[in-house]
Amino acid sequence: MQYEFLKNFPKRMKNVGLYGVLIQNSIQKTSWKQFGFLKFDEQMNLIFAVMLYIMEQSLREENCTMDDIGAYIDTINTRYLGKEISYDDCRKLGDFVVNVILSNEGRAMYFDGYDFEENDYHVMHISYVANRIVYLDQEVRRTSYYLTDDGYNLILSTLEIENNMK
């Protein structure tokens, strides 16, 4: 290969794709306006705050239901963000972030990354969150969310890896 620095290009593009697909899923959505999140910056901050919450719940091996996510958004909204939205709206906002933005409404997400060694594009699957059925008090059936490897890679690339390089 003439340019050695292009050797792991698909891996780099997978990381770029994690951001690209997330932004693409979020930027055109008008639903943000009904919750008072008009600026792209606000939207990205909330998405990552929700992802961090899901990660923390997973690391603690605790369930992370939509009720939990809604309560979390309500708490950070009341304490920090100050948007004029109700608890019910916070739950709807959580559902929007998790199921529309992060899960693409159940449709698979892909990003094409070029492989200079094979002279072709590689289609890379992207998935930020997954879910499983849990039973609360052995009776109530709920969906609990957790980050996938892609979700962890995205979150960890925002701070933890940079700190490890210092």
Model segments located where?
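Short amphipathic alpha-helical boundary/capping segments
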Residues: F37-L38
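Long, contiguous hydrophobic alpha-helical segments, chiefly transmembrane helices and signal peptides
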Residues: I47, M51, I69, Y145-G151
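Short, glycine/acidic-rich hinge or "gate" loops at secondary-structure transitions
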Residues: M66, E84-R91
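Positively charged, polyanion-binding regions of nucleic-acid-associated proteins
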Residues: D41-M66, D95, L159, M165-K166
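Charged low-complexity interaction tracts in eukaryotic proteins
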Residues: Y3-K33, R91-E160
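DNA-recognition alpha helix
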Residues: T65-G82
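Eukaryotic basic, amphipathic alpha-helical target segments in cytosolic regions
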Residues: S58, N77-L81, E105
